[in-house]
Amino acid sequence: MLFRSPVFPYQMTTRYEITSHVTGTITIDGETTVVDCPGQRDHSWGVRDWWQFPWNWTAGHLDDGTSFHAARSIIPQLELFATGYTIAPDGTFAEAAGDEIVVAEVVTDPETLPVSSRQRIGEVEFTSRPVGHAPVLLVAPDGRVARFPRAMCRYETPDGRRGTGWTEYNWPEGWPDLLHRA
């Protein structure tokens, strides 16, 4: 696989994020599939306490060539972190932080899987609708539990652009009900 990126990886202290275009082939059980699509690479070297607080991670690509990524804590009246970026179709990179990254109106089903949400990263506002889920139940050695619903999503902006990507939520048990239930 070849990952071509329009910009240098967005680096944080213990991780990096990079929007890419992925080409190559994958062979499984003798069947080869050609890959030619937008992608996202991220890697983390840091220690993660999944049971500490709720957060959201989102990355996607729109049909006009816009790419975006953000991660932020989701705690009412408390901001622990909020960081991300957008890349315009012409390759212009814009960092986003703090109140430039909004996760709002997260609607979940009875299993705590996301049904929809409204988000904004910098100047890019969009709604997300999951089309496939890959949830993970995280259990700490001391018994604490966090639900980690991950979803492949379709995105749509108010001006009609559409795209696809991935969103993840981390919902540790014991936090107040921060969600809208479907």
Predicted regions, residues:
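Structured soluble/peripheral alpha/beta segments that form catalytic or ligand/cofactor-binding pockets
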Residues: 1-182
